[in-house]
Amino acid sequence: MVDSSRDSCFKAGKFSAPGFRFHPTDEELVVYYLKRKICCKKLRVNAIGVVDVYKVDPSELPGLSMLKTGDRQWFFFTPRNRKYPNAARSSRGTATGYWKATGKDRVIEYNSRSVGLKKTLVFYRGRAPNGERTDWVMHEYTMDEEELGRCKNAKEYYALYKLYKKSGAGPKNGEQYGAPFQEEEWVDSDSEDADSVAVPDYPVVRYENGPCVDDTKFCNPVKLQLEDIEKLLNEIPDAPGVNQRQFDEFVGVPQGNSAEVIQSTLLNNSSGEYIDPRTNGMFLPNGQLYNRDSSFQSHLNSFEATSGMAPLLDNEKEEYIEMNDLLIPELGASSTEKSTEFLNHGEFGDVNEYDQLFNDISVFQGTSTDLSCLSNFTNNTSGQRQQLLYEQFQYQTPENQLNNYMHPSTTLNQFTDNMWFKDDQAALYVQPPQSSSGAFTSQSTGVMPESMNPTMSVNPQYKEGQNGGGTRSQFSSALWELLESIPSTPASACEGPLNQTFVRMSSFSRIRFNGTSVTSRKVTVAKKRISNRGFLLLSIMGALCAIFWVFKATVGVMGRPLLS
């Protein structure tokens, strides 16, 4: 029975609009239509009628279909009749011919289980086996035995058939069997409004001023006109912007990238003081402590020591004993300057602390200095060259520092050749008028200045071997006497191959040389001479044996004894 309710789109075997077709898949035909038919369940759309296809000629079957859509394929339920009483094979003979199975059977699966079987049948006119093949094709869908066992109310066994006619002989893959469109069948009638659906003229978007029922507002819809929509769209560009959210945990982060903010962040601490983590102690090339002249020291009184950095550095030094404490003369309290700050920070504009220091030097000497040139010079050279000097001195092993202290000529040459001592601007190294003429003539290196300040000068009151009062510490003197009492060659003491094993390069790499001692060389030469003598003696013995065997062979050929 065809569903003819008002809400159904399928009426009297036709669909209410073009484009709707009954085109189920193989799984839908077996699992829904065939299974529900066998289980005596109701179908939502009765598009398949019950017809015995084996008792009717194929040309008459389209008129018996419940589908009147004009499609060129039809569906039928047929009770299965057996050819033999005790066999499952069906009888496919008709009054005008017979249906013959062709091709391979296809198993229909659903949820990874077999639910049915599909066969392809072709109609032949006449009696078997001399029938004439026609273009009528039918697909037979049968349910699997296990799936059939799931039906509890099964009373009769059906098979589902899909019938269509090909356009000609041979396979017709992809051929469409839908009904051809005819415009005359879908002419609208003003009197027919059965399936019309009422659509509101205006969309319902908001509610206001509705009556209240039990403290709950019951809102009535308000229609939004087209003019209101245009007004809302025009007000969007003038709408106020959305305020950005502020997070409390990021309040202290400086907002902005101005030069003042960056300078304050990098150069100033919370109290406005400039903190230099490196100490400013300086040493002469011969390893002695250098103390600036009192007149020069007076120009540095514009700096103030930070309150917390110097004690921290002193505590760190007291916790460890380094090789420098044993080999280098003890440093006085005045040897290490404290980190300083400018009283009037920013007095010279963009000139940094090194420019102000060079300006103080020029004032002390009575000369003028261009602060802009000094700023460019320090910015280009201070960060690179001074960092290299500082790391080369700070990260030396205690043994290398000892060798550099005893024979500092190599380090000074490297310092003067590779760094900016060769520059024509060497006059920037300010020396007091009474500086010693032989201060830098000594080929002494090895002890680099601890501070990164390039300004170096010599005070004549300090000479080699003096510190404060001009005397060495008792512990250092005793240690040197102990080292001098060790019986060893000078090469192993200060200029041995161990000192020249690692040569520091500009790229911070190391070239390794194999060093051998003089004693080992003498032993090796003596062993070579003994081995050469043994080899010569062995060669002479071999030659004598060869001559003997040659004479013996000659006598044997001649047939007479050797001594006769």
From Swiss-Prot:
Keywords: Activator, DNA-binding, Membrane, Nucleus, Stress response, Transcription, Transcription regulation, Transmembrane, Transmembrane helix
SUPFAM superfamilies: NAC domain (SSF101941)
Residues spanning the membrane: 535-555
Domain NAC: 16-166
DNA-binding region: 115-172
Superkingdom, natural source: Eukaryota
Disruption phenotype: Stay-green phenotype during senescence, salt stress and oxidative stress.
Subcellular location: Membrane; Nucleus
Pfam families registered for this protein in UniProt: NAM (PF02365)
Tissue and organ expression note: Expressed in roots, rosette leaves, shoot apex, stems and flowers.
Induction cue: By cold, salt, drought stress and methyl methanesulfonate (MMS) treatment.
Membrane topology field: Single-pass membrane protein
UniProt cross-references to Gene3D superfamilies, sorted A to Z: NAC domain (2.170.150.80)
GO cellular component terms, semicolon-separated: membrane; nucleus
InterPro entries named in the record: NAC-dom (IPR003441), NAC_dom_sf (IPR036093)
One example GO MF annotation: DNA-binding transcription factor activity
GO BP annotations listed: positive regulation of DNA-templated transcription; positive regulation of leaf senescence
Domain notes: The NAC domain includes a DNA binding domain and a dimerization domain.
Record function comment: Transcriptional activator activated by proteolytic cleavage through regulated intramembrane proteolysis (RIP). Transcriptional activator that promotes leaf senescence by up-regulating senescence-associated genes in response to developmental and stress-induced senescence signals. Functions in salt and oxidative stress-responsive signaling pathways. Binds to the promoter of NAC029/NAP and NAC059/ORS1 genes.
PANTHER family referenced in this protein's UniProt entry, alphabetically: NAC TRANSCRIPTION FACTOR, PROTEIN CUP-SHAPED COTYLEDON 2-RELATED
Protein name, entry field: NAC domain-containing protein 16
Organism encoding this protein: Arabidopsis thaliana (Mouse-ear cress)
